[in-house]
Regions:
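Beta-lactam-recognizing serine transpeptidase/beta-lactamase-like catalytic domain environment
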Residues: 67, 109, 208-213, 218-221, ...
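Periplasmic/cell-envelope proteins involved in peptidoglycan metabolism and beta-lactam response
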Residues: 1-285, 307, 329, 386-396, ...
C-alpha cells in the first residue's frame, strides 16, 4: 500500500511541478516576448510625448510678417490609464458636460485604449494656467503643447490658405501624420506643407503613481528634438494686397497683379474675401460652414478657379498670332461693316487702331484669315488645319492649360481644338462660320484671370513670360524653385508686340480709346478693355501694364455682373492698383473714394438663408 501511495504522491508532485514550470515559462514569455503586454507595462510608468515643431512663418516681399504661431495646448488621454476618476469634478474643471465627456472618451477608446489621443484641443494659455494645479489628480490625462496659426493682417486668405486636422485620406496616404495632427488645407499652407510643417520630435517622461511627470527617461538619451518648419518669403506686397481687397470690398470679382520681369505675384485677391483668422482654432468648423453656405462664395478663388470668356482683351493675342503667321500686316485695315456687332467708331486702318478701338469686325476678318488659310480646297479640312495652328500659338501665351503657379486648384480654361469641335459637331461638320465668336473672346474660349494678367506680362515683356509664382524662396538656405526662372517665349516677333503696346497705350491715352478712366497723370498706362458676356449682367474686364517702357506691374481686373463695360469699372480700379504700387500712394482721392465705395452689382444678394429640404 505504501508503495502505491508513494507512486500517487510522485505523480501529483510531477503535475504540480509541470504546472509551475508552465507558469514560469508563460510569465517569462510575457515579460520578454509579448510586445503588447510589454508596451502596456511600460505605459504604466513612462509617457511618450510627441514634440510638435513650430510651423514655418510667412513674410511678404518687403520682410513684413504675414503668418506666425501662438502657443496652445491639447489635453491628451490614454484611456486604459484613466482610473479612480472623479468625473463630476473633472467635467467642472475643464468646462464640459458629462455627455460630452462620455462621447470624447468613447472616441479615444475607439482610436486606441493604450495610445494617447486628443481629448480636448487648442486650449488657451489662460485655461491651461487654471487647470495646471489640478491636472495631476486626473490619472491618464496630460497636456501636450503645440502651436496655432495667427494671420497678422486680415488679408490674402485665398493665397495664404488655412490649416486643419488631418482626415482619413491624409492618414492612409502619408505615414508622417497621426490622428489629431494638422495639415495645410489650401493656399500656400497646402502647397508648401512639407517645407512648413517641420519634423516632429519625441520625449519620454517618467510618471509617478500620482500622474506627475518626475523627469526624462534615461536622462533624455532616447528623446529626439523637433525641427521647426522652414519660413516662406513670398512675392506678395502686403500693402498692395490690402489695398486691392479694400477697393473690391463690396464687389464680386478678382485682381491679379504681377511683376512682368520676374513673374512674381504682387497681389492676388478674390472678392468677396474673408479674414483668414476665421478658419483658426476651435471656431474653425462653425465659420467654415458659414462661409461655405454664403451665396457669394467667399471660399471660391476666382483669380485661379473662375473660367470666364475673356472678351475683347483676347483680341491682343489674336492680332499677334495673325501678324506672326503673315495673314495680316501691321498696316492691314478692315471696314467696320457690322458683320458682327460693334459700337460706333471709324474703320480701323491698321492693327494699332484696331486694338485701340476694339473693332469686332476687324478681328472677325483677322480670325477668318487665321482659320481659313487656303491650305486645303475642302473648307472643313482647311478650318481644321487653321484651328490647329491657332491652338498651338494660344497655348504659348499660357492659355488652355493649368499654369504651374505654386497654389492648388488652378483651372485651365478652354482653348478649343479640333477634337473639341469634332466631338461637338462631328468630323467635317464645322468651319470658321461655326466658330467665329472665338475671334472676339467669346464662343467656347474661356480663361482664368491669372492667364489674362499673364497676357499683360507678355505684352509688357514684348513676347515672353516667367511662370507666375508666390514664393521667392524658403528656408535658411534661401531655396528657390528653378522652374520659376525659366523664360517662356511665344516665338512671335518683338516688333509686333511693340505695336500691341502702342495700341494699348492709345486705349488709355489716345483719342477714341475705350479706357480713359484708367489715365494716371505722369504714368504711361497701357491697357485693354473687355466685356465678358454672361447670362445675367456682363462682366467688366481690363488688363494693363505700366509704365509703357520698363514696366513694373501688370494687372488683370474682373468685376462680375457690373452694369458697364471694361472701361467703366475694371479700368479705373486697375489704375488705382497701378498708382498705389508705383507711387506708394494714390493721389487721385476722388477716383479712389468713388470706386472704393461704389457697388456696381447692387441687385445681387451677398448672402442667403439655406432652406431645409422638404420631407416627402
Amino acid at each position: 500500500m505504501s508503495n502505491k501511495y508513494a507512486h500517487r504522491s510522485g505523480i501529483v508532485k510531477i503535475i504540480f511541478l509541470s504546472v509551475g514550470v508552465l507558469f514560469v515559462l508563460r510569465l517569462s514569455m510575457l515579460q520578454l516576448f509579448d510586445k503588447e503586454y510589454k508596451e502596456k507595462a511600460k505605459n504604466q510608468s513612462l509617457r511618450n510625448i510627441t514634440q510638435y515643431p513650430a510651423r514655418g512663418l510667412m513674410y511678404d516681399r518687403n520682410g513684413k510678417l504675414l503668418v506666425y504661431n501662438e502657443a496652445v495646448y491639447d489635453l491628451m488621454v490614454i484611456p486604459r490609464m484613466v482610473k479612480d476618476l472623479d468625473t463630476a469634478f473633472f467635467c467642472r474643471s475643464v468646462g464640459i458636460t458629462r455627455e460630452d465627456f462620455e462621447a470624447r472618451m468613447e472616441k479615444a477608446y475607439t482610436y486606441s485604449p493604450y495610445s494617447a489621443s486628443i481629448f480636448m484641443k487648442q486650449i488657451s494659455k489662460e485655461d491651461f494656467g487654471r487647470w495646471e494645479n489640478v491636472l495631476y489628480r486626473f490619472k491618464g490625462f496630460y497636456i501636450s503643447k503645440r502651436t496655432l496659426r495667427i494671420y497678422d493682417r486680415p488679408i490674402a486668405a485665398h493665397v495664404l490658405g488655412y490649416v486643419g486636422e488631418v482626415n482619413e485620406h491624409d492618414l492612409e496616404t502619408n505615414p508622417y501624420y497621426k490622428r489629431g495632427d494638422y495639415i495645410g488645407k489650401s493656399g500656400l499652407e497646402a502647397s508648401y506643407e512639407e517645407e512648413l510643417r517641420g519634423i516632429k520630435g519625441k520625449k519620454i517622461m517618467q510618471v509617478d503613481v500620482h500622474n506627475r511627470e518626475v523627469g526624462p527617461y534615461m536622462h533624455g538619451q532616447m528623446d529626439t528634438m523637433a525641427q521647426e518648419g522652414m519660413n516662406l518669403y513670398t512675392t506678395l506686397d502686403a500693402d498692395l494686397q490690402e489695398y486691392a481687397e479694400k477697393v473690391m470690398a463690396n464687389k464680386r470679382g478678382c485682381i491679379v497683379a504681377i511683376e512682368p520681369s520676374t513673374g512674381e505675384v504682387l497681389a492676388l485677391m478674390s472678392a468677396p474675401c474673408y479674414d483668414p483668422n476665421l478658419l483658426v482654432g476651435r471656431i474653425r468648423g462653425e465659420n467654415f460652414k458659414r462661409l461655405n453656405s454664403d451665396i457669394a462664395k467667399p471660399l471660391f478663388n476666382r483669380a485661379l478657379q473662375a473660367q470666364y470668356p475673356p472678351g475683347s482683351i483676347f483680341k491682343v493675342a489674336q492680332a499677334m498670332v495673325a501678324l506672326h503667321l503673315g495673314v495680316i500686316t501691321p498696316q492691314t485695315g478692315f471696314v467696320c461693316d457690322k458683320v458682327i456687332g460693334c459700337h460706333n467708331h471709324p474703320s480701323a486702318r491698321n492693327v494699332q487702331e484696331a486694338i485701340k478701338m476694339s473693332c469686332n469686325p476687324y478681328f472677325y476678318y483677322t480670325y477668318r484669315r487665321v482659320i481659313q488659310q487656303g491650305k486645303y480646297k475642302n473648307i472643313y479640312k482647311d478650318s481644321q488645319y487653321g484651328l490647329t495652328v491657332w491652338h498651338d500659338y494660344m497655348t504659348r501665351f499660357g492659355f488652355g492649360y493649368r499654369m504651374p503657379i505654386d497654389l492648388p486648384g488652378v483651372k485651365k480654361g478652354n482653348i478649343p481644338d479640333t477634337a473639341f469641335y469634332n466631338k461637338w459637331y462631328g468630323r467635317e461638320r464645322w468651319a470658321f462660320t461655326t466658330i467665329y465668336s472665338n475671334s472676339i473672346g467669346q464662343g467656347e474660349v474661356e480663361v482664368v484671370p491669372l492667364q489674362m494678367a499673364n497676357l499683360a506680362c507678355i505684352v509688357a515683356n514684348r513676347g515672353y513670360f516667367y511662370t507666375p509664382h508666390l514664393v521667392r524662396y524658403y528656408g535658411p538656405d534661401s531655396i528657390k524653385n528653378p522652374e520659376f526662372y525659366e523664360k517662356h517665349e511665344t516665338g512671335i516677333e518683338r516688333e509686333f508686340f511693340d505695336i500691341a503696346a502702342r495700341g494699348m497705350y492709345d486705349v488709355v491715352h489716345g483719342a477714341g480709346g475705350t479706357a480713359h478712366k484708367a489715365d494716371i497723370p505722369d504714368i504711361e498706362v497701357c491697357g485693354k478693355t473687355g466685356t465678358a458676356e454672361n447670362y445675367g449682367n456682363d462682366h467688366s474686364v481690363f488688363i494693363a501694364f505700366a509704365p509703357k517702357d520698363k514696366p513694373q506691374i501688370a494687372v488683370a481686373v474682373y468685376v462680375e455682373n457690373a452694369q458697364g463695360g471694361g472701361g467703366t469699372w475694371a479700368a479705373p480700379i486697375a489704375s488705382l492698383i497701378i498708382e498705389k504700387y508705383i507711387r506708394g500712394e494714390v493721389k487721385r482721392k476722388d477716383v479712389e473714394k468713388y470706386y472704393t465705395e461704389i457697388n456696381p452689382c447692387q441687385k445681387l444678394p451677398l448672402t442667403r438663408r439655406i432652406k431645409k429640404p422638404r420631407r416627402r
